[in-house]
Amino acid sequence: IAVHEPLVPLVDHLPEATLAFELPTPFPVGPVNCYVLLDSPVTVVDPGMLFGQTLATLVAELGGVGLGVRDVEAVVVTHAHPDHYGTAGWLAEQADAPIYAGRAELPKLLDTRDRHQLYELIRTFGIPEDMLGVFPAFYGAVQQWLHVIDESRVIPVDDGDTLWLGGRPLEAMVTPGHAAGHLSLWEPTSSRLLSGDHLLPSITPNPLVELDHESDLLRRRSLVEYLDSLARFETLNPDVVLPGHGPAFTSVAQLVATTRLHHLSRADEILAHIQRTGAP
C-alpha cells in the first residue's frame, strides 16, 4: 500500500448530523474511517474490524455524542474487507440492527470459503510457490478479526436503491472494481458522497482479483469494472466526499482523472512487458 500526499483539495467541514472518526487497524493501510449518521435511524457506516483498539474507539466515539452501542439502528458495510466490516456482525447483534451491503459482497460477507476458492484460482496464475504461501496464512489470520454475521440481519442492496438512513434518503451506487459489490452512497440534497474505498485522496484504489459468481468466467474483470464505475463519479460533482481512508475532500473530477490515468498507464506498462518477454 502506497500512501501519498492528497491529490485534491481537502475539506474541514462535515455535513450536518454526521460524525467521522478513524478506527485503528494492524494493516499497512493504517486506520479506516467510520461514519455515524446521527439522525434516526442512527446509522454506522463501516464499523471497522474485530480488534480490541477498534472496539474501544468505536464505543468511546459513540459515547462522546451521547450514544451507546444499542442506540445504533442500522449498519452499512461499503465492502467486505476485514478493516471495514469485521465488527459489523457484533455491532448488529448488540444493537439488534440490520446490515446493509451490496448484493455481490454477500459471498465474502457470509461465507469465508470464498477466500479459499480465490486462493485456488490464484494458484493458476503462475505465482511462485513461496509467494503463494502468504495467502493461506493471511486468510487464517483474518478470521480472528471477523465476527460471524447472522444472515437474517443482512439486507442486500442493489444499484439505484434508495435507503432511508440517518434521517435522509441516500441513493445506493454499486461501484465494483475494488470489491465486486462495493457500495457508495450519494445524497444529492446535501451533495455528499460516501465513497468507501472506490475513491481515496491519498491512496490509489486497487482493483482486486475476485471470483465471478454470476457468469461462467472464473474471475471478474475488476479493472474494467473499476474504470466504468469511476466514470459514474465524474457527473456527481459533490461538495464533500467522505472516503474509507484519509480526509474528506472535494474536486472529484480531478481525482477521477488522475486515478484513471494511473491505472491506464500501469496497464500499458504490463502490456509492453508481455509483448517484450512473450509472457502468457
Model-predicted regions and their roles:
Residues 9-65, 71, 185-201:
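Conserved beta-strand hairpin/beta-sheet module of binuclear metal-dependent hydrolase folds
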Residues 14, 94-95, 237:
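Short, structured coil segments at secondary-structure junctions
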Residues 14-22, 141-146, 166-168:
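Short Pro/Gly-enriched beta-strand edge/turn motifs at strand-loop
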Residues 17-19, 58, 153, 159-161, ...:
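Short beta-strand or tight-loop elements
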Residues 30, 53-55, 63-164, 191, ...:
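Active-site HxH/HxHxD metal-binding segment of metal-dependent hydrolases
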Residues 43, 49-51, 143-154, 169-267:
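Metallo-beta-lactamase
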Residues 272-280:
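Short capping segments at the starts of secondary-structure elements
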